Amino acid sequence: MRIRKRLKLLALLGAVLAIALVAASCGDDDDTPSVAPAPEAPAEAPAPAPAGEDPFAGCGAGAVIDPSDLSVGRPVARCEPGYPLPIPLAERTTINMSSGFKLEFIAPILLAEAFGEFEKENIDFNFISLGFSDAVSQVGTGDIDLAVGGTEASLFNAVDNGFDVRWVSGNFFPPDAGDRTIAQTGVWARADVFSDPSNPDIAELEGTTMASAVGLSSVIAYPIAQAFRPAGLVLGVDVAIERIPSTDMVLALENNAVQSAWVLDPLWSVLADAPDEYVLVTTQPPGEPIGGLYGGPSCFEAKRDACVAFHRAIIRTINTYLTGDYHQDEDVVAAIAEAIERDPEQIAATPSLLFDWEIREGSATRAQEAFISFTASGETVVEFDEPFPEDQVVDRSLYLEAIGRG
């Protein structure tokens, strides 16, 4: 059994060398490969709207979902394929966007570039390889227009320091988030921690050690803290944190160096193959993106029209190519594989992501509350003791305008 697990783990490691925080939808991994050559767009790629045609005609009632809906299996916002139609900018404009990753969770952006959707909006796209915590201050000064990241401590600390940086659109959530009976990214633990592994009591994690790639400042700490709260546990106090690279977490669990870990795609499949030894304890919150794009003064002022056009392009890419089980579409998988420099088989081996450009109500507040609670651990994660109001850290207007709801 252990030999088979190790062989499978070695086979999977190649798919995750750059995934320190994919489950967090963000991070500071700067080892990002260069942009791959653009694959040829499928024939059905939309063209600019003909004169007189409503560019938002395909964005009906389903293009906006009640932001308070966090239910398992809730609908996600969608327009018809090809919508919203392009509305080219009057002047060629460059959008400078940073990301510490070039991985599948930013496929809407990478495929918008590869399939010419930015070109249709008269946008030049400049990809900057930079982790979120390093980029956020440059977003605040307007040197970077948009940053891929997570709703993490560095965002709120930047706001606390006077920068006007806001979460402007979401990214994705695992389709089965919230259903612990389905193996997926989440907190996995050794079965021998629990008196009844078939129904694990989170309270029994008290006194154990959890592996984390980043620590308490990552947005992943939010869903973990949320799961621990009903059991009366505080991450960093009742459950110790040990920083371990994501690719080493399975072996750390196997060797009992840690008793739990947030395990990413596709490494959790090794643990799922040994249900008598490991159990899934909690997942990402259901129906809730916890990362996405973050904008500052340039998107709110001088480049607002371009930032709206950028969102129009990525929303159109989601509606056209990345809806449903898109891993069944060989052309789309091939395009993603080329853009992120991975094998198509590695991509197809994991579930398709559920892309969601919307931001749920209260997500930013709940994340702040988690970071504030960590002061009990003796580690200063944020330097304020009350959450900022949502309208100071969230701005939904760019994506709403992109679908004709501005």
How would you name each of these model-derived features?
Residues R2-L13:
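Bacterial N-terminal signal peptides that target proteins for export
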Residues L12-A20:
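Hydrophobic helical h-region of N-terminal Sec-dependent signal peptides
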Residues L21-S25:
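C-terminal motif of bacterial Sec signal peptides marking the signal peptidase cleavage site
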Residues G27-A49, F56:
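Short, low-complexity, disordered segments immediately C-terminal to signal peptides
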Residues G52-D238, E242-R243, Q259-D265, L280-G287:
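Short, glycine-/small- and polar/acidic-enriched structural segments
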Residues D54-L70, I372-G406:
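Conserved C-terminal helix/tail region of periplasmic/extracytoplasmic solute-binding proteins
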Residues T247-E338:
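Pocket-lining segment of extracytoplasmic ligand-binding domains
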Residues E301-E383:
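Secondary-structure end/capping motifs
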